[in-house]
Protein backbone atom coordinates (compact mmCIF):
# COMPACT_ATOMS: atom_id res chain seq x y z
CA UNK A 1 0.00 0.00 0.00
CA UNK A 2 3.10 2.27 0.16
CA UNK A 3 1.66 4.10 3.23
CA UNK A 4 1.11 1.20 5.60
CA UNK A 5 -1.31 2.95 7.97
CA UNK A 6 -3.72 4.21 5.27
CA UNK A 7 -6.40 2.13 3.53
CA UNK A 8 -6.06 1.34 -0.16
CA UNK A 9 -8.91 2.79 -2.19
CA UNK A 10 -10.62 -0.10 -3.98
CA UNK A 11 -13.13 -0.62 -1.15
CA UNK A 12 -12.53 -4.37 -1.10
CA UNK A 13 -10.95 -6.35 1.75
CA UNK A 14 -8.76 -9.32 0.83
CA UNK A 15 -9.23 -10.84 4.27
CA UNK A 16 -12.95 -11.29 3.58
CA UNK A 17 -12.40 -14.11 1.11
CA UNK A 18 -11.58 -15.02 -2.47
CA UNK A 19 -14.41 -12.97 -3.99
CA UNK A 20 -13.24 -9.75 -2.35
CA UNK A 21 -9.61 -10.48 -3.22
CA UNK A 22 -10.53 -11.11 -6.84
CA UNK A 23 -12.58 -7.92 -7.03
CA UNK A 24 -9.69 -5.95 -5.54
CA UNK A 25 -7.27 -7.40 -8.10
CA UNK A 26 -9.67 -6.58 -10.92
CA UNK A 27 -9.94 -2.96 -9.71
CA UNK A 28 -6.19 -2.45 -9.69
CA UNK A 29 -5.70 -4.30 -12.99
CA UNK A 30 -8.04 -1.78 -14.62
CA UNK A 31 -6.11 1.12 -13.10
CA UNK A 32 -2.84 -0.44 -14.24
CA UNK A 33 -4.16 -0.90 -17.78
CA UNK A 34 -4.65 2.86 -18.02
CA UNK A 35 -1.35 4.03 -16.53
CA UNK A 36 1.17 1.25 -17.26
CA UNK A 37 2.94 -1.34 -15.15
CA UNK A 38 5.97 0.88 -14.45
CA UNK A 39 3.78 3.49 -12.75
CA UNK A 40 1.90 0.81 -10.81
CA UNK A 41 3.56 -2.55 -10.16
CA UNK A 42 1.64 -5.83 -10.06
CA UNK A 43 1.84 -6.05 -6.26
CA UNK A 44 0.93 -2.41 -5.52
CA UNK A 45 -2.42 -1.29 -4.09
CA UNK A 46 -2.37 2.39 -3.18
CA UNK A 47 -4.14 4.62 -0.71
CA UNK A 48 -5.64 7.90 -1.95
CA UNK A 49 -2.64 10.05 -0.99
CA UNK A 50 -0.14 7.68 -2.59
CA UNK A 51 -2.18 7.45 -5.80
CA UNK A 52 -2.42 11.25 -6.09
CA UNK A 53 1.34 11.59 -5.60
CA UNK A 54 2.02 8.83 -8.13
CA UNK A 55 -0.28 10.21 -10.81
CA UNK A 56 0.26 13.96 -10.26
CA UNK A 57 2.77 14.43 -13.12
CA UNK A 58 0.46 12.52 -15.48
CA UNK A 59 -2.82 14.36 -14.83
CA UNK A 60 -1.67 17.80 -13.63
CA UNK A 61 -2.26 19.49 -17.00
CA UNK A 62 -5.82 18.20 -17.31
CA UNK A 63 -6.65 18.82 -13.65
CA UNK A 64 -4.94 22.16 -13.00
CA UNK A 65 -3.81 23.47 -16.36
CA UNK A 66 -0.15 23.35 -15.31
CA UNK A 67 2.68 22.36 -17.61
CA UNK A 68 5.21 20.00 -16.03
CA UNK A 69 8.02 18.58 -18.15
CA UNK A 70 7.95 14.97 -17.00
CA UNK A 71 10.46 13.99 -19.70
CA UNK A 72 13.21 16.26 -18.41
CA UNK A 73 14.66 14.17 -15.61
CA UNK A 74 16.27 10.86 -16.48
CA UNK A 75 16.40 8.28 -13.71
CA UNK A 76 19.56 7.65 -11.73
CA UNK A 77 19.76 4.27 -13.48
CA UNK A 78 19.76 6.01 -16.87
CA UNK A 79 22.36 8.57 -15.79
CA UNK A 80 24.62 5.73 -14.68
CA UNK A 81 24.29 4.00 -18.05
CA UNK A 82 24.08 6.90 -20.51
CA UNK A 83 27.65 6.73 -21.83
CA UNK A 84 27.39 2.93 -22.04
CA UNK A 85 24.16 3.28 -24.05
CA UNK A 86 25.81 5.75 -26.43
CA UNK A 87 28.81 3.45 -26.90
CA UNK A 88 26.66 0.40 -27.67
CA UNK A 89 24.53 2.32 -30.17
CA UNK A 90 27.60 3.73 -31.93
CA UNK A 91 29.89 0.70 -31.93
CA UNK A 92 27.61 -2.35 -31.99
CA UNK A 93 24.15 -1.28 -33.17
CA UNK A 94 23.21 -4.80 -34.27
CA UNK A 95 23.62 -6.14 -30.71
CA UNK A 96 21.66 -3.18 -29.34
CA UNK A 97 18.81 -3.83 -31.76
CA UNK A 98 18.77 -7.55 -31.03
CA UNK A 99 18.48 -6.96 -27.29
CA UNK A 100 15.77 -4.30 -27.66
CA UNK A 101 13.73 -6.66 -29.83
CA UNK A 102 14.19 -9.45 -27.28
CA UNK A 103 12.83 -7.24 -24.50
CA UNK A 104 9.89 -6.17 -26.66
CA UNK A 105 9.12 -9.80 -27.48
CA UNK A 106 9.21 -10.84 -23.81
CA UNK A 107 7.75 -7.80 -22.05
CA UNK A 108 6.07 -5.67 -24.70
CA UNK A 109 5.99 -1.93 -25.26
CA UNK A 110 5.58 -1.22 -21.53
CA UNK A 111 9.36 -1.74 -21.17
CA UNK A 112 10.12 1.25 -23.43
CA UNK A 113 9.34 4.10 -21.07
CA UNK A 114 12.49 6.27 -21.05
CA UNK A 115 11.50 9.67 -22.43
CA UNK A 116 14.23 11.98 -21.16
CA UNK A 117 15.14 14.83 -23.47
CA UNK A 118 18.40 15.50 -21.61
CA UNK A 119 20.56 13.77 -24.23
CA UNK A 120 19.33 14.92 -27.66
CA UNK A 121 22.38 13.45 -29.41
CA UNK A 122 21.14 9.93 -28.62
CA UNK A 123 18.86 8.64 -31.38
CA UNK A 124 15.92 7.20 -29.46
CA UNK A 125 14.44 5.68 -32.60
CA UNK A 126 17.55 3.72 -33.54
CA UNK A 127 18.08 0.01 -32.94
CA UNK A 128 14.44 -0.81 -32.16
CA UNK A 129 14.30 1.89 -29.48
CA UNK A 130 17.27 0.59 -27.46
CA UNK A 131 17.82 4.02 -25.84
CA UNK A 132 14.17 4.24 -24.71
CA UNK A 133 14.33 0.96 -22.80
CA UNK A 134 13.51 1.32 -19.11
CA UNK A 135 17.20 1.25 -18.04
CA UNK A 136 16.66 -1.36 -15.34
CA UNK A 137 16.45 -3.86 -18.21
CA UNK A 138 20.19 -3.39 -18.68
CA UNK A 139 20.73 -5.15 -15.32
CA UNK A 140 20.20 -8.86 -14.79
CA UNK A 141 19.40 -8.39 -11.08
CA UNK A 142 16.27 -6.48 -12.12
CA UNK A 143 15.16 -9.06 -14.68
CA UNK A 144 15.68 -11.87 -12.16
CA UNK A 145 13.46 -10.13 -9.61
CA UNK A 146 9.99 -11.60 -10.09
CA UNK A 147 8.43 -8.76 -8.07
CA UNK A 148 9.75 -6.23 -10.58
CA UNK A 149 9.33 -8.21 -13.80
CA UNK A 150 6.39 -10.57 -14.22
CA UNK A 151 7.64 -13.19 -16.70
CA UNK A 152 7.32 -16.91 -17.12
CA UNK A 153 10.49 -18.76 -16.10
CA UNK A 154 11.30 -19.61 -19.72
CA UNK A 155 10.95 -15.99 -20.85
CA UNK A 156 13.09 -14.81 -17.93
CA UNK A 157 15.87 -17.26 -18.81
CA UNK A 158 15.76 -16.23 -22.47
CA UNK A 159 15.97 -12.54 -21.62
CA UNK A 160 18.90 -13.11 -19.26
CA UNK A 161 20.63 -15.08 -22.01
CA UNK A 162 20.13 -12.21 -24.46
CA UNK A 163 21.46 -9.68 -21.93
CA UNK A 164 24.59 -11.75 -21.35
CA UNK A 165 25.03 -12.03 -25.09
CA UNK A 166 24.92 -8.23 -25.25
CA UNK A 167 27.56 -8.01 -22.49
CA UNK A 168 29.84 -10.32 -24.49
CA UNK A 169 29.42 -8.40 -27.76
CA UNK A 170 32.39 -6.33 -28.95
CA UNK A 171 32.78 -2.56 -28.95
CA UNK A 172 36.15 -2.93 -30.68
CA UNK A 173 38.76 -5.63 -31.17
CA UNK A 174 39.91 -5.42 -27.54
CA UNK A 175 36.82 -4.33 -25.62
CA UNK A 176 33.53 -6.06 -24.86
CA UNK A 177 30.31 -4.20 -24.11
CA UNK A 178 30.27 -5.50 -20.54
CA UNK A 179 27.58 -4.77 -17.94
CA UNK A 180 26.04 -1.32 -17.72
CA UNK A 181 27.48 0.79 -14.87
CA UNK A 182 25.62 0.39 -11.58
CA UNK A 183 26.80 3.68 -10.05
CA UNK A 184 26.11 7.34 -10.79
CA UNK A 185 27.41 10.52 -9.16
CA UNK A 186 25.45 13.14 -7.25
CA UNK A 187 27.26 16.49 -7.23
CA UNK A 188 26.61 19.27 -4.73
CA UNK A 189 28.51 22.57 -4.89
CA UNK A 190 28.48 25.69 -2.76
CA UNK A 191 30.51 28.90 -2.72
CA UNK A 192 32.82 29.42 0.26
CA UNK A 193 32.25 32.29 2.71
CA UNK A 194 29.86 34.12 0.38
CA UNK A 195 28.54 36.18 3.30
CA UNK A 196 32.04 37.47 3.98
CA UNK A 197 32.42 38.46 0.32
CA UNK A 198 29.09 40.30 0.39
CA UNK A 199 30.10 42.28 3.45
CA UNK A 200 33.44 43.20 1.89
CA UNK A 201 32.45 43.88 -1.74
CA UNK A 202 28.66 44.57 -1.48
CA UNK A 203 25.79 42.33 -2.49
CA UNK A 204 25.45 43.76 -6.00
CA UNK A 205 29.08 43.04 -6.88
CA UNK A 206 28.91 39.48 -5.60
CA UNK A 207 25.49 38.85 -7.19
CA UNK A 208 26.79 39.95 -10.59
CA UNK A 209 29.63 37.43 -10.44
CA UNK A 210 27.38 34.68 -9.13
CA UNK A 211 25.09 35.25 -12.12
CA UNK A 212 28.07 34.76 -14.44
CA UNK A 213 28.93 31.50 -12.70
CA UNK A 214 25.34 30.25 -12.70
CA UNK A 215 25.09 30.87 -16.45
CA UNK A 216 28.07 28.55 -17.00
CA UNK A 217 26.75 25.66 -14.91
CA UNK A 218 24.21 23.96 -17.23
CA UNK A 219 26.59 23.89 -20.20
CA UNK A 220 29.47 22.61 -18.08
CA UNK A 221 27.38 19.80 -16.61
CA UNK A 222 25.94 18.93 -20.03
CA UNK A 223 29.42 18.65 -21.59
CA UNK A 224 30.14 15.97 -19.02
CA UNK A 225 26.95 14.03 -19.86
CA UNK A 226 25.26 15.21 -16.68
CA UNK A 227 21.93 16.75 -15.80
CA UNK A 228 21.61 19.95 -13.78
CA UNK A 229 18.84 19.59 -11.22
CA UNK A 230 19.34 23.00 -9.67
CA UNK A 231 21.64 25.94 -10.26
CA UNK A 232 21.17 29.27 -8.53
CA UNK A 233 23.78 31.71 -7.30
CA UNK A 234 26.60 29.68 -5.79
CA UNK A 235 24.54 26.48 -5.37
CA UNK A 236 24.61 23.54 -7.77
CA UNK A 237 22.95 20.12 -7.65
CA UNK A 238 23.57 17.74 -10.55
CA UNK A 239 23.75 14.07 -11.51
CA UNK A 240 26.51 12.64 -13.70
CA UNK A 241 28.01 9.37 -14.91
CA UNK A 242 30.95 8.02 -12.92
CA UNK A 243 33.51 8.64 -15.69
CA UNK A 244 32.96 12.38 -15.97
CA UNK A 245 31.92 13.51 -12.49
CA UNK A 246 35.31 14.45 -11.04
CA UNK A 247 36.37 16.48 -14.07
CA UNK A 248 33.00 18.24 -14.05
CA UNK A 249 33.47 19.15 -10.38
CA UNK A 250 36.95 20.48 -11.12
CA UNK A 251 35.71 22.53 -14.08
CA UNK A 252 32.90 24.04 -12.00
CA UNK A 253 35.47 25.15 -9.41
CA UNK A 254 37.51 26.74 -12.21
CA UNK A 255 34.42 28.50 -13.63
CA UNK A 256 33.69 29.89 -10.17
CA UNK A 257 37.21 31.28 -9.83
CA UNK A 258 36.96 32.79 -13.33
CA UNK A 259 33.66 34.49 -12.47
CA UNK A 260 35.37 36.05 -9.43
CA UNK A 261 38.68 36.69 -11.18
CA UNK A 262 38.94 40.22 -9.76
CA UNK A 263 38.05 39.11 -6.21
CA UNK A 264 40.71 37.10 -4.35
CA UNK A 265 39.85 34.12 -2.16
CA UNK A 266 36.49 33.42 -3.83
CA UNK A 267 36.40 29.63 -4.01
CA UNK A 268 33.98 26.75 -4.48
CA UNK A 269 33.70 23.54 -2.48
CA UNK A 270 32.11 20.42 -3.97
CA UNK A 271 30.91 17.08 -2.67
CA UNK A 272 30.45 14.03 -4.87
CA UNK A 273 28.73 10.82 -3.87
CA UNK A 274 29.23 7.87 -6.19
CA UNK A 275 26.10 5.90 -5.32
CA UNK A 276 24.92 2.43 -6.26
CA UNK A 277 21.67 2.78 -8.20
CA UNK A 278 19.60 0.91 -5.56
CA UNK A 279 20.62 3.21 -2.69
CA UNK A 280 17.68 5.53 -1.82
CA UNK A 281 18.21 8.95 -3.37
CA UNK A 282 17.27 10.68 -0.12
CA UNK A 283 20.18 8.96 1.63
CA UNK A 284 22.55 10.00 -1.16
CA UNK A 285 21.45 13.65 -0.97
CA UNK A 286 21.82 13.68 2.82
CA UNK A 287 25.37 12.33 2.55
CA UNK A 288 26.27 14.87 -0.14
CA UNK A 289 25.21 17.69 2.19
CA UNK A 290 27.14 16.21 5.11
CA UNK A 291 30.26 15.75 2.99
CA UNK A 292 30.07 19.31 1.73
CA UNK A 293 29.41 21.00 5.06
CA UNK A 294 31.41 18.85 7.48
CA UNK A 295 34.25 17.49 5.37
CA UNK A 296 34.97 19.82 2.45
CA UNK A 297 34.27 23.05 4.33
CA UNK A 298 34.60 22.54 8.09
CA UNK A 299 37.27 19.83 8.36
CA UNK A 300 39.34 20.59 5.27
CA UNK A 301 39.10 24.37 5.37
CA UNK A 302 36.99 25.08 2.24
CA UNK A 303 38.14 25.30 -1.40
CA UNK A 304 37.99 21.51 -1.29
CA UNK A 305 36.54 18.40 -2.89
CA UNK A 306 34.95 15.65 -0.78
CA UNK A 307 34.15 12.33 -2.46
CA UNK A 308 32.42 9.22 -1.12
CA UNK A 309 31.58 5.86 -2.67
CA UNK A 310 28.31 4.43 -1.34
CA UNK A 311 27.21 0.89 -2.09
CA UNK A 312 24.15 -0.87 -0.70
CA UNK A 313 26.04 -1.86 2.45
CA UNK A 314 27.47 1.55 3.29
CA UNK A 315 30.52 3.65 2.47
CA UNK A 316 33.66 2.11 1.01
CA UNK A 317 35.75 5.29 0.86
CA UNK A 318 35.64 8.99 1.76
CA UNK A 319 38.35 11.13 0.17
CA UNK A 320 38.74 14.81 1.01
CA UNK A 321 41.31 16.96 -0.77
CA UNK A 322 42.24 20.42 -1.95
CA UNK A 323 41.79 20.99 -5.68
CA UNK A 324 45.56 21.00 -6.18
CA UNK A 325 48.39 19.53 -4.12
CA UNK A 326 52.16 19.77 -4.08
CA UNK A 327 53.91 16.68 -5.36
CA UNK A 328 56.05 15.09 -2.67
CA UNK A 329 59.57 16.51 -2.48
CA UNK A 330 58.89 19.26 -5.04
CA UNK A 331 57.27 22.68 -5.36
CA UNK A 332 55.21 21.47 -8.32
CA UNK A 333 51.42 21.78 -8.02
CA UNK A 334 49.26 19.08 -9.56
CA UNK A 335 45.53 18.66 -9.96
CA UNK A 336 44.21 16.23 -7.34
CA UNK A 337 41.59 15.05 -9.84
CA UNK A 338 44.28 14.35 -12.43
CA UNK A 339 46.25 12.36 -9.85
CA UNK A 340 43.35 10.10 -8.93
CA UNK A 341 42.39 9.63 -12.59
CA UNK A 342 46.02 8.82 -13.41
CA UNK A 343 46.05 6.19 -10.70
CA UNK A 344 42.74 4.80 -11.93
CA UNK A 345 44.23 4.40 -15.40
CA UNK A 346 47.16 2.47 -13.93
CA UNK A 347 44.74 0.20 -12.06
CA UNK A 348 42.26 -0.25 -14.90
CA UNK A 349 43.98 -3.18 -16.55
CA UNK A 350 45.89 -1.20 -19.15
CA UNK A 351 48.92 -1.42 -16.86
CA UNK A 352 48.01 -3.96 -14.18
CA UNK A 353 45.57 -6.82 -14.23
CA UNK A 354 42.44 -6.43 -12.12
CA UNK A 355 43.71 -8.92 -9.55
CA UNK A 356 47.09 -7.23 -9.18
CA UNK A 357 45.64 -3.72 -8.91
CA UNK A 358 43.14 -4.79 -6.26
CA UNK A 359 45.86 -6.65 -4.39
CA UNK A 360 48.16 -3.61 -4.44
CA UNK A 361 45.53 -1.25 -3.02
CA UNK A 362 44.48 -3.55 -0.21
CA UNK A 363 48.04 -4.55 0.64
CA UNK A 364 48.89 -0.88 1.01
CA UNK A 365 45.90 -0.36 3.27
CA UNK A 366 47.05 -3.23 5.49
CA UNK A 367 50.67 -2.03 5.42
CA UNK A 368 49.80 1.51 6.51
CA UNK A 369 47.51 0.23 9.25
CA UNK A 370 50.31 -2.04 10.48
CA UNK A 371 52.94 0.74 10.43
CA UNK A 372 50.71 3.01 12.48
CA UNK A 373 49.45 0.35 14.86
CA UNK A 374 45.85 0.97 13.80
CA UNK A 375 43.88 -2.24 14.11
CA UNK A 376 40.83 -1.17 12.10
CA UNK A 377 40.39 1.24 9.19
CA UNK A 378 37.29 3.30 8.50
CA UNK A 379 36.47 5.34 5.37
CA UNK A 380 37.89 8.85 5.71
CA UNK A 381 40.58 7.98 8.26
CA UNK A 382 43.70 10.14 8.17
CA UNK A 383 46.50 8.11 9.68
CA UNK A 384 49.51 9.53 11.49
CA UNK A 385 52.75 8.19 10.03
CA UNK A 386 56.21 8.79 11.50
CA UNK A 387 58.50 10.22 8.83
CA UNK A 388 61.37 8.08 10.13
CA UNK A 389 59.55 5.02 8.83
CA UNK A 390 60.35 6.07 5.24
CA UNK A 391 56.92 5.37 3.82
CA UNK A 392 58.14 5.67 0.24
CA UNK A 393 60.49 2.71 0.69
CA UNK A 394 57.75 0.52 2.14
CA UNK A 395 55.34 1.48 -0.62
CA UNK A 396 57.89 0.83 -3.35
CA UNK A 397 58.43 -2.66 -1.94
CA UNK A 398 54.70 -3.37 -2.20
CA UNK A 399 54.57 -1.97 -5.74
CA UNK A 400 57.47 -4.18 -6.84
CA UNK A 401 55.82 -7.17 -5.19
CA UNK A 402 52.53 -6.51 -7.00
CA UNK A 403 54.31 -6.15 -10.35
CA UNK A 404 56.24 -9.36 -9.77
CA UNK A 405 53.06 -11.26 -8.88
CA UNK A 406 51.52 -9.91 -12.07
CA UNK A 407 54.62 -10.82 -14.12
CA UNK A 408 54.47 -7.24 -15.36
CA UNK A 409 57.65 -5.81 -16.85
CA UNK A 410 56.20 -2.84 -18.73
CA UNK A 411 55.25 -0.74 -15.68
CA UNK A 412 57.75 1.73 -14.23
CA UNK A 413 57.83 0.92 -10.50
CA UNK A 414 59.36 4.32 -9.66
CA UNK A 415 56.59 6.18 -11.50
CA UNK A 416 53.88 4.05 -9.88
CA UNK A 417 55.44 4.50 -6.43
CA UNK A 418 55.52 8.29 -6.86
CA UNK A 419 51.89 8.30 -7.98
CA UNK A 420 50.82 6.19 -5.00
CA UNK A 421 52.78 8.30 -2.50
CA UNK A 422 51.41 11.59 -3.85
CA UNK A 423 47.86 10.25 -3.68
CA UNK A 424 48.32 8.99 -0.12
CA UNK A 425 49.06 12.47 1.24
CA UNK A 426 46.30 14.23 3.13
CA UNK A 427 45.67 17.62 1.50
CA UNK A 428 43.92 20.04 3.86
CA UNK A 429 43.56 23.80 3.52
CA UNK A 430 44.19 24.20 7.24
CA UNK A 431 46.61 22.72 9.76
CA UNK A 432 45.93 19.19 10.89
CA UNK A 433 45.54 18.37 14.57
CA UNK A 434 49.25 18.10 15.37
CA UNK A 435 51.98 20.67 14.79
CA UNK A 436 54.67 18.07 15.41
CA UNK A 437 57.00 18.25 12.35
CA UNK A 438 58.00 14.60 12.64
CA UNK A 439 54.45 13.50 11.91
CA UNK A 440 52.83 13.13 8.50
CA UNK A 441 49.23 12.31 7.65
CA UNK A 442 48.23 9.83 4.98
CA UNK A 443 44.90 8.48 3.81
CA UNK A 444 44.27 5.35 1.78
CA UNK A 445 40.93 6.66 0.45
CA UNK A 446 42.43 8.24 -2.68
CA UNK A 447 43.72 4.82 -3.76
CA UNK A 448 40.39 3.18 -2.95
CA UNK A 449 38.64 5.84 -5.02
CA UNK A 450 41.06 5.22 -7.91
CA UNK A 451 40.32 1.49 -7.69
CA UNK A 452 36.58 2.24 -7.87
CA UNK A 453 37.04 4.56 -10.86
CA UNK A 454 39.07 1.86 -12.61
CA UNK A 455 35.93 -0.33 -12.65
CA UNK A 456 33.91 2.40 -14.38
CA UNK A 457 31.23 2.03 -11.72
CA UNK A 458 30.43 -1.50 -12.83
CA UNK A 459 29.51 -4.42 -10.63
CA UNK A 460 29.64 -8.05 -11.66
CA UNK A 461 26.20 -8.63 -13.17
CA UNK A 462 25.11 -12.16 -12.42
List the predicted regions and their residue ranges.
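Regulatory and interdomain segments flanking nucleotide-handling catalytic cores
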Residues: 1-462
